[in-house]
């Protein structure tokens, strides 16, 4: 049972109470202070001090100071008045117990409110930090978008300047062709004049030298007419023998039928042009060429202007949808822009057009499998991605980069199976 402490001293003013309590040699670490508006308890085993205060105090602003083996309390009164005693008198045990329980409940409520207030303040801080981070990210995103827009404007200006240069060059060539044509027409006219003049001179000479007979005059006239008309050109034929294309494949591994089919498909793809597009009337001749558009898209891809590159490939595909490299290159752009489903579609379309599989299209088929596999892996479809990588390795087993990536995908799949 703890020993009650009674050797304390206290003083007061109308607004505060000053209480001095000796610790009796007890370590400060072992001292526990509990204070509410009507109750003060100091527990420093084996001693105990309790005070059922005469009037309510402001326990939040009140304070305690420990020093020189003594605790000095400064208790601020809620109402300015002088107390008759420090503790209320005439309190029985039941009343004391009720005051203790009420004080504990008040302390618990206050602690709960403080915890909730702290949690609310923490949430506000987190909300503020999140808003600041979102603002920073938005500014960074806007900065990146501005950079992209500037690059797009720059590329557009360069493209327009290049178009203007091509237009002027084409106009210059047209003027030169017209000048040459005019010169040729002048030369032809002069030649005709000379021939006409020679014919006229020859005709006059024949008339002067010919006999006066009617029949002889007709004979010479007919002869002059025949001489004035040039003889028709002789007809000839030119034989052309084309050199057949031969694939560098060993005879035991030869795929003559497939190779011929591939060559036939390539020739058809080059001839397949869709000119029934409304926008074609505003384009120049070189802009209507899918090969030119493909090269332009490749240059834009190299400058990381992926949206402009996609636009170039789109127009090229509208002009000729049988060229597999257009789909293959557009799939690479979609991968860069994280348009993963579109990358899968374009890679699959490229693989359809790269049939039958021959040595000439092996590299393109390998790239199509790798790009589709990459898109599958970024969609976390690792099994499908591994299948494409293994297909790429069947085409090019010595490709170290594809081998390393395929091994990484296998490790991811095995790790997922172990976790499940």
UniProtKB/Swiss-Prot annotation:
Region (Mediates interaction with ESR1 and STUB1): 7-103
GO CC term (a single one): nucleus
UniProt cross-references to PROSITE patterns, sorted A to Z: CS (PS51203), TPR (PS50005), TPR_REGION (PS50293)
Record keywords: Cell projection, Cytoplasm, Neurogenesis, Nucleus, Repeat, TPR repeat
Taxonomic source organism: Pan paniscus (Pygmy chimpanzee)
A GO term for molecular function: nuclear estrogen receptor binding
Alphabetical list of Pfam families matching this protein: CS
Subunit-structure text: Interacts with ZMYND10. Interacts with STUB1. Interacts with ESR1 and ESR2. Interacts with DNAAF2. Interacts with CCT3, CCT4, CCT5 and CCT8. Interacts with DNAAF6/PIH1D3.
Domain CS: 3-87
Protein name as catalogued: Dynein axonemal assembly factor 4
BP GO annotations: cilium movement; determination of left/right symmetry; epithelial cilium movement involved in extracellular fluid movement; establishment of localization in cell; heart development; inner dynein arm assembly; learning or memory; neuron migration
Function: Involved in neuronal migration during development of the cerebral neocortex. May regulate the stability and proteasomal degradation of the estrogen receptors that play an important role in neuronal differentiation, survival and plasticity. Axonemal dynein assembly factor required for ciliary motility.
Source organism, top-level taxon: Eukaryota
Signal sequence coordinates: none
Protein's cellular compartments: Nucleus; Cytoplasm; Cell projection, Neuron projection; Dynein axonemal particle
